[in-house]
């Protein structure tokens, strides 16, 4: 579990995060949604230590990341898997070498052990046959699957996904969502997904946080976000035709 307690963050005179309180549950797909420029990515970067907070606490299973020394922070970062918006894969490395990369950086595993682990992770995303090829030989959807394999290579306790469906067609998005959900439940990971994709929110979101103007305006489950009357959330939700249909259908069933 991850807890965010009273977190504030400014850049110059601009306060980007204002007294944020939130919780992200273990074994659940936790989603951060909201309009662009309202603090979603900044919050995620603060949680994983890419930005320092001005004040507040970030607890990883009750361990306060903000007061840890460098060595302690490194140990926590080893427990975090990252799936980036862009694939962030190394074109000069094979698929297998990409998955092995964090293992080579942060473990003392032998090459054989790393290959075995990489093969296991690639098999988990149905890409075993791709191990000796290069990422550039694959579509965006397959590159995302390679990214997932790399993200779970270290057997993480926490998984952060930044816009995992960005640039993907609907069919591929459903596949990526399914993998994220399966891995979260199978390994009991605390997963945090930053997204604009309301389809994903309804399909796999267990715990949803709506951030607006740098504040946590609302947090709840998918049923709650479908039925909420909060005007700021509604303005964001109704930008999705899919969500309009879902809300209309639910309202009709309740009549």
Language-model regions: role of each:
Residues 48:
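Helix-to-loop junction immediately C-terminal to a conserved catalytic motif
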Residues 134-138, 142:
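Conserved ABC ATPase signature
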Residues 159-162:
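Catalytic Walker B motif of ABC-type/P-loop ATPase nucleotide-binding domains
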